From Swiss-Prot:
The lineage of its organism: Bacteria, Pseudomonadati, Pseudomonadota, Alphaproteobacteria, Rhodobacterales. SUPFAM superfamilies: L-aspartase-like (SSF48557). Belongs to the lyase 1 family. Argininosuccinate lyase subfamily. Disulfide bonds: none annotated. It catalyses: 2-(N(omega)-L-arginino)succinate = fumarate + L-arginine. It comes from Cereibacter sphaeroides (strain ATCC 17029 / ATH 2.4.9). Its EC number is 4.3.2.1. PROSITE patterns: FUMARATE_LYASES. InterPro entries: Arg_succ_lyase_C, Argininosuccinate_lyase, Fumarase/histidase_N, Fumarate_lyase_CS, Fumarate_lyase_fam, Fumarate_lyase_N, L-Aspartase-like. This is Argininosuccinate lyase. Gene3D superfamilies: Fumarase/aspartase (C-terminal domain), Fumarase/aspartase (Central domain), Fumarase/aspartase (N-terminal domain).
Length: 471
């Protein structure tokens, strides 16, 4: 009787040669990643087909074996996409599940596929391909939301509303200018995803476990086949690098922050106390007890869900911060964070695009709010500087005194009489009242990047051209 262990009872037929027994059930549960990394099936099969083609081109595989592998992998792909593929936990991950099924389909040639390859570089290329695709999806989602904000900006280029600091009225601005602020934020988000995509577009396949391989492989061939610009230059870095995932999460977190900020504004603006916007029935819900309620649940949920994206970034940074080179099993914890962040961000982008596209601004409420709260006080101070040659600090003091008087009277600055103003400074003239109107205030803000309606229209046209939407 042989003392050799039965391969069927070993830990895993793919790596169990030195093991006499299989893992504990709890170890198997900890170790298995198929429950989440099966999402990489398309990338895994694509990478394997490119690897097999390269091995054949280099004479490492026969053309017959390479053809059988390629066709077998397409069969596996079809089975998975049909929804009936029997993923097996004991095979741990997507790589082993695909290879095991390939062996069932084509037999011995399947065992040759892993020549000059390790799961370390295999998962690195699979994951990089997936994240690269997700960068493209995020860019498309961001551009759709930018267009929704641009439509609002064009429609409301001259609608006056209050600009806020500390959530208190500061100065009049235009609705269009406020919408364009989010276009600018989203443009930076788009740029971050584009930058991250460009940086991650190097192929780690061929780094093998960590040291490269002695087989005469052509890494440039596989890199080109998979749409990468070049192969990675250091095999140690190739298998240990998760910067691409961290960059994706960082860009996602900043984008999520922007979505959450506008979601917060929608919650505030749609309240009865503000009445700045009306959200459509598509993005609101009612109450089971209060018939009058129309709750901004989509905005509230989006505001909360975006926190998950920030949490995912922190989680992966925490996983990676203490790892020596090269691969450690800790790195298996990278995918769930990225998958959840990507799903959450894409859902948030789609929901926000719908809400922005449907929302209706209440011009009357916006204008009324803009005209209250002494919003043109800065215009008055500027007038004192321009017309009376006061130092700005003196003009600031005079204006503050007038605000205090108006507040004591229970009125706004335009409601003070000329005589009351002249009691504070005798040089004030009748023409001061022209700068105290909110419409004149926003029209005067013509500096580059300012809120003047003509500026808003010009910026909206510029962004439409940059997005390829110009007429």
């Amino acid at each position: 009787m042989s003392d050799a262990p039965d391969p069927s009872s070993a830990a895993n037929a793919m790596w169990g040669g030195r093991f006499a027994a299989g893992p504990d059930a709890i170890m198997q549960a900890i170790n298995a990643s198929i429950g989440f990394d099966k999402r990489l099936y398309a990338q895994d099969i694509r990478g394997s087909r490119a690897h097999a083609a390269m091995l054949a081109a280099q004479g490492i595989l026969t053309s017959r074996d390479a053809e059988a592998i390629g066709e077998g992998l397409l069969t596996v792909l079809s089975e998975i996409e049909a929804g009936g593929f029997p993923f097996r936990v004991e095979l741990e991950d997507i790589h082993m599940n695909v290879e095991a099924r390939l062996k069932e389909l084509i037999g011995e040639p399947a065992g040759r596929l892993h020549t000059a390859r390790s799961r370390n570089d295999q998962v690195a290329v699979d994951f990089r391909l997936w994240v690269r695709d997700q960068c493209d999806a995020a860019i498309s989602g961001i551009e759709a939301l930018m267009r929704a904000f641009l439509a609002q900006a064009e429609a409301g280029a001259d609608w006056v509303m209050p600009g806020f600091t500390h959530l208190q009225t500061a100065q009049p601005v235009t609705w269009g200018h406020h919408m364009l602020a989010y276009v600018e934020m989203l443009a930076r988000d788009r740029s971050r995803f584009k930058d991250a995509r460009a940086r991650m577009n190097e192929c780690p396949l061929g780094a093998a476990a960590l040291a490269g391989t002695g087989f005469p492989i052509d890494r440039h061939m596989t890199a080109a086949a998979l749409g990468f610009d070049r192969p990675t230059a250091n095999s140690l870095d190739s298998v240990s690098d998760r910067d691409f995932a961290l960059e994706f999460l960082s860009a996602s977190a900043i984008c999520a922050l922007h979505l959450s900020r506008f979601a917060e504004e929608l919650v505030i603006w749609s309240s009865a106390q503000f009445r700045f916007v009306r959200l459509s029935d598509r993005w609101t819900t009612g109450s089971s007890i209060m018939p009058q309620k129309k709750n901004p649940d989509a905005a509230e949920l989006l505001r909360a869900k975006m926190g998950r994206v920030l949490g995912a970034a922190v989680a992966l940074f925490t996983v990676m911060k203490g790892l020596p080179l090269t691969y450690s099993k800790d790195m298996q914890e990278d995918k769930e964070q990225v998958f959840d962040a990507a799903d959450t961000l894409m859902l948030g982008l789609a929901a926000m695009t719908g809400m922005v596209g449907d929302m209706q601004a209440n011009r009357e409420s916006l204008a009324a709010a803009a005209a209250s709260g002494f919003s043109t006080a800065t215009d008055l101070a500027d007038w004192l500087v321009r017309e009376l040659n006061l130092p700005f600090r003196d003009a600031h003091h005079v204006t503050g005194t007038l605000v205090a008087r108006a507040e004591a009277r229970g009125c706004d600055l335009p409601d003070l009489s000329l005589a009351e103003m002249q009691e504070v400074h005798p040089g004030i003239r009748e023409d001061v009242f022209a700068v105290l109107g909110v419409e004149n205030s926003v029209r005067s803000r013509t500096s580059y990047g300012g809120t003047a309606p003509d500026n808003v229209r010009a910026q909206a046209a510029r962004w439409k051209e940059l997005l390829g939407d110009a007429a």
